[in-house]
UniProtKB/Swiss-Prot annotation:
Its main location: plastid. One of its GO terms (cellular component) is proton-transporting ATP synthase complex. F-type ATPases have 2 components, F(1) - the catalytic core - and F(0) - the membrane proton channel. F(1) has five subunits: alpha(3), beta(3), gamma(1), delta(1), epsilon(1). F(0) has four main subunits: a(1), b(1), b'(1) and c(10-14). The alpha and beta chains form an alternating ring which encloses part of the gamma chain. F(1) is attached to F(0) by a central stalk formed by the gamma and epsilon chains, while a peripheral stalk is formed by the delta, b and b' chains. Keywords: ATP synthesis, CF(0), Chloroplast, Hydrogen ion transport, Ion transport, Membrane, Plastid, Thylakoid, Transmembrane, Transmembrane helix, Transport. This is ATP synthase subunit b, chloroplastic. The gene is atpF.
Amino acid sequence: MKNVIDFVIISGYWPPAGGFGLNANLLETNLINSGVVLGLPVYSGKGVLSNLLNNRKQTILSTIRDAEERYEEATDKLKQARTRLQQAKIKADEIRINGLSRMEGEKQDLVDSADGNSKRLEDSKNATIRFEEQRAIEQVRQQVSRLALERALEVLNIRLNSELQSRMIDYHIDLLVRAAENTTD
């Protein structure tokens, strides 16, 4: 209980520190000192801050100009690259068209050559067939002639006797005499 009494006595001397408020005494608040402490660096640092800001501004402007120049260069290079790409596409199309034309020409040449070879082979085959036909015909003629001569000789040998031979000789001699007389007249 003594503690409670001591607490009541002490609280009577000091006011309780439980709230906040506005102190209207300027000297106690040290507002002027704070203003001087804060204002002096602002006033004296104004030039330095201005120089820093100007330097930063110049750096930013320089960076922007460099970026714009690089952008222009990149744009020019892009245009040049597009032009080269277009030229390359045109050249590739020309090469492709020339290749196709050459391929068609060579294909046609091969077809023509094959047709020519086929025609030559056909002509050679036909000539060989004609030659073989002629040879066969000639062999048949020779055999027919030989057989005809053999048959005629057989018939003559059978029919030809000495009397017929004499008459034939006389007949042919008479023909020769008349022919000789006609030529001398």
